[in-house]
Amino acid sequence: MTCFKLCCRRDLFAFPYPVAIWKEPPRSIEVVRDLVESYGIEQIYTVGDIVTTNFLKYSLAPTSAAVDGKTRRGLKIDKPTFFRKTIEVYNPPGYITEEAWIAVEEAVRDNVMIKVNGEEDMLSLAFIKLAPPHSVVVYGHYMGALIAIPVDWYRDAICKLFEYLEKC
């Protein structure tokens, strides 16, 4: 069983790890495109409605994505039709439920949009742990930055955050 619940040190999860791009789209997407091209990134995983929408809008299609249909800015986001398959899961705030974990396992193998009933934020951690080599996980930071995590370089360090999660 793979289910995790945030139990302490929420502040560590709000930190802008490690490549924070403080630019608006389309420039922020161009920076990620440069990262992808320069370092041989083969898979892109996006977490968040606005991030996923911007990647599709500016022609840097993610391999898979996780969205929850909500944005901090209150914008209505249409369901992207780019993905081959959609998986719907329940994942409350501060959790990575077992069904969400299983959906991420499938998403790193195929072109999947995970539609979350609840909150998708913590799924970035599941993507970082499960993504294959030569991947980048990208999500929006609540203060406005685009966060890009090349998993080959940062997976081990960021997966230490699992120490602050309890199994559920």
UniProtKB/Swiss-Prot annotation:
Protein family: Belongs to the GTP-dependent DPCK family.
Q: Give the matching HAMAP family.
A: Dephospho_CoA_kinase_GTP_dep (MF_00590)
Protein name per UniProt: GTP-dependent dephospho-CoA kinase
InterPro entries found in the cross-reference section: GTP-dep_dephospho-CoA_kin
Q: Tell me one Pfam family matched here.
A: DUF359
Supply the source organism for this entry. Pyrobaculum islandicum (strain DSM 4184 / JCM 9189 / GEO3)
Q: Any stretches that span the bilayer, and where are they?
A: none
Q: In which pathway does it act?
A: Cofactor biosynthesis; coenzyme A biosynthesis
